[in-house]
């Protein structure tokens, strides 16, 4: 039966879900079942009435509403106790504000830490940290340890929120910055709070020392327990102070503050084992007070902020368990320590690689934000000291050695040439800062943003080529032996290709591609993007060598002494080698997929509303804004990858064999790399088993089986280990 209600001044909020409560309210119920059914008869079979006010947001809300996992409002219908706020709980005597015992302090602090972590993982403050009544108004608290801790947590939340907002690398699924009008302890200074925490810490340390066992003395179990509990409170208070001091250090502009943060993180890490071992000393939540909700702890009320939540209830916040708390903090500390290392880098390319590698770990929103604000400080200088323009010039020098940036070149002091290069470098700042900021977003959002930034880099590419041409014609008049062709253009093209490659590869990590799409993704990478990347790197290497030769000749002319020639390690050689390995891995996967398709092992969808061409064009749509390299359209791809142009056309066994050779080649390249890193070892873990599997398939193993193979992406995100089922 469908009912329509006219509700007059009803204040029962989410309690309307209970039928007995509906009966008590001043509601005049009207049966509209008949009217509704008659209205529905006007619609044809399968037809839906879509009101313009009923958009996607309302549709999602309708799906989520009253689902206990998605709708936080559902908990309210299952609770029979009276929900009290902080002041009411104090009057009622259900909460202690003075003389808290050590087990009570430990239990409350641990639950607070769990709420803090849950907030950092994307839930709202109202459903997490502010379910702790002590945090609502620390002025009411008389217990010094609890008061200092509550203020410390508020300050940590406030500074973390400020950092995340400033870095602007979060989306709605990452972080919720709303404070719901709660006071964030703004009336108390950061210094005062750290001082209060230090006082409690010192007091606890005295108690720890006074209860410590003395040599030759028989130990009283009660004194030993008190010693353990005091040590547990001391560790938690000190951890709170250290974490707060670290966040304060990151707000300072001096680079020395980063070293200070690194030191403090080591102190925080040392406290974790004591916190982990003493979790058992804290009071536990009471289980019998509620149904369907997490158990209630003294000082906590999960439903206290229910009316502050938006009308479409947010998802139910599952507070993490205490056992997971220490593990999370341990990883957070490691991430913050890694963030501190970025200030040791001087080259823009190394910084970009650092951001890429850091992002691959899928770090939390706080550590991502700290990395962003450490890199580009308020004064818009890198690490607060270097101009971004200077970083771009250094990157150009180390990559292509353009003559215009060489002090020994005639263009170096030419005003017009200076204007050209300065204007170009200034135009580079925004796209490169945006690119670094993109690497601060979560992995799924990054991919979307990489597709958009290609437009900016395409414009930059066009400008680079024009500046190159202008500088080249100027240089020819004065130094005909030197060239300025494709110097700046090569550098921008290199970054363009890196973005395109990253865009395609991230689709494997995010599991966006179906198995039948793998072949054209790997083809585009191996035959096109990696081929372009290697020629770009080779061109940059040649440009460097040409500039070095000119410099050497100039040196020879000045000095009559013979210099011993040392074999110099080429700066780009490792990257060229890695690109060759990646190209071989992609080529191996492409040929594997074509062979599987020939053997009928690839399940293809029955295309009705789309086709392979539509999917292909959708996958490579962002590349249409790029002029160099020109995008490969579907018909062009089909023509280029057509096997019938070979005489005789290769069979599946030939392709499996060719694929095994590609994997073998990748293995050889990688095994010759000195000091292999994790990435090299990860690719080897894929290449080696794939060589064996391809050889088996080439020999006719399971040829008649139509069961699709399995692709295991666990050893490497972009290249799977092929498994025969």
UniProtKB/Swiss-Prot annotation:
It comes from the Eukaryota. GO terms for cellular component: cytoplasm; NatC complex. It is found in: Cytoplasm. The keyword Cytoplasm applies. GO terms for biological process: negative regulation of apoptotic process; smooth muscle cell proliferation. Residues 558-571 have a biased composition (Basic residues). Transmembrane segments: none annotated. Keywords: Cytoplasm. Residues 548-573 are annotated as: Disordered. InterPro entries: Naa35/Mak10 (IPR007244). Auxillary component of the N-terminal acetyltransferase C (NatC) complex which catalyzes acetylation of N-terminal methionine residues. N-terminal acetylation protects proteins from ubiquitination and degradation by the N-end rule pathway. Component of the N-terminal acetyltransferase C (NatC) complex. Belongs to the MAK10 family. This is N-alpha-acetyltransferase 35, NatC auxiliary subunit.
């Amino acid at each position: 039966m469908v009912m329509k209600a006219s509700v007059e001044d009803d204040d029962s909020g989410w309690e309307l879900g209970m039928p007995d409560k509906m009966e008590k309210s001043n509601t005049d119920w009207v049966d509209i079942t008949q009217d509704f059914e008659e209205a529905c008869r006007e619609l044809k079979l399968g037809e839906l009435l879509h009101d313009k006010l009923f958009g996607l947001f309302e549709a999602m809300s309708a799906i989520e509403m009253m689902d206990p996992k998605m709708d936080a409002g559902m908990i309210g219908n299952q609770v029979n106790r009276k929900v009290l706020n902080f002041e009411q709980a104090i009057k009622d005597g259900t909460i202690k504000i003075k003389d808290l015992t050590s087990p009570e302090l430990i239990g409350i602090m641990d639950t607070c830490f769990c709420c803090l972590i849950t907030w950092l993982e994307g839930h709202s403050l109202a459903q997490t940290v502010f379910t702790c009544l002590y945090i609502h108004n620390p002025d009411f608290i008389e217990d010094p340890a609890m008061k200092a801790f509550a203020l410390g947590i508020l300050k940590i939340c406030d500074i973390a929120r400020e950092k995340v907002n400033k870095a602007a690398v979060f989306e709605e699924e990452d972080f919720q910055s709303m404070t719901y009008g709660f006071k964030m302890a703004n009336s108390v200074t950061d210094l005062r709070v750290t001082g209060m925490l230090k006082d409690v810490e010192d007091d606890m340390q005295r108690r720890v020392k006074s209860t410590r066992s003395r040599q030759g003395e028989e130990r009283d179990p009660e004194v030993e327990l008190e010693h353990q509990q005091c040590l547990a409170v001391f560790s938690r208070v000190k951890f709170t102070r250290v974490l707060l001091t670290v966040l304060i250090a990151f707000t300072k502009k001096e680079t020395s503050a980063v070293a200070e943060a690194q030191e403090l993180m080591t102190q925080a890490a040392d406290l974790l084992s004591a916190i982990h071992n003493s979790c058992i000393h804290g009071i536990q939540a009471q289980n019998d007070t509620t149904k369907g909700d997490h158990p209630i702890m003294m000082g906590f009320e999960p439903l206290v902020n229910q009316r502050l939540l938006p009308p479409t209830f947010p998802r139910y916040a599952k507070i993490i368990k205490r056992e997971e708390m220490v593990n999370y903090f341990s990883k957070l500390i490691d991430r913050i320590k890694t963030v501190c290392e970025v200030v040791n880098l001087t080259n823009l390319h190394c910084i970009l690689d650092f951001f890429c590698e850091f992002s691959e770990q899928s770090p939390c929103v706080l550590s991502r934000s700290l990395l962003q604000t450490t890199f580009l400080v308020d004064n818009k200088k890198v690490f607060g000291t270097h101009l971004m323009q200077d970083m771009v010039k250094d990157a150009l020098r180390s990559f292509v050695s353009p003559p215009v940036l060489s002090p020994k070149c005639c263009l170096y002091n030419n005003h017009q040439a200076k204007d050209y290069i300065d204007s170009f470098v200034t135009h580079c700042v925004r796209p490169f800062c945006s690119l670094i900021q993109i690497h601060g977003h979560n992995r799924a959002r990054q991919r979307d943003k990489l597709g958009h930034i290609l437009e900016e880099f395409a414009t930059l590419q066009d400008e680079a080529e024009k500046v190159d041409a202008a500088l080249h014609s100027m240089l020819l008049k004065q130094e005909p032996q030197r060239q300025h062709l494709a110097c700046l253009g090569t550098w921008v093209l290199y970054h363009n290709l890196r973005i395109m490659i990253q865009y395609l590869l991230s689709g494997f990590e995010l599991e966006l591609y179906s198995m039948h799409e793998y072949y054209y993704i790997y083809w585009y990478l191996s035959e096109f993007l990696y081929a372009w990347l290697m020629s770009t790197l080779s061109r940059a290497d040649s440009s460097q060598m040409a500039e070095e030769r000119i410099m050497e000749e100039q040196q020879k002319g000045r000095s009559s002494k013979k210099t011993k020639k040392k074999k110099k390690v080429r700066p780009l050689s490792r990257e060229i080698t890695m690109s060759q390995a990646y190209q071989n891995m992609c080529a191996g996967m492409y040929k594997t997929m074509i062979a599987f398709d020939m053997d009928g092992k690839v399940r293809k969808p029955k295309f009705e509303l789309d086709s392979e061409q539509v999917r292909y064009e959708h996958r490579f749509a962002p590349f249409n804004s790029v002029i160099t390299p020109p995008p490969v359209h579907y018909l062009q791809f089909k023509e280029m990858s057509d096997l019938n142009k070979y005489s005789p056309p290769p069979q599946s066994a030939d392709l499996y064999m060719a694929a095994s050779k590609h994997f073998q080649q990748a293995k050889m390249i990688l095994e010759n790399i000195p000091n292999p890193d994790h990435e090299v070892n990860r690719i080897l873990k894929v290449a080696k088993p794939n060589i064996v599997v391809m050889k088996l398939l080439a020999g006719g193993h399971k040829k008649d089986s139509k069961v699709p193979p399995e692709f295991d992406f666990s050893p490497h995100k972009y290249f799977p280990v092929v498994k025969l089922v």
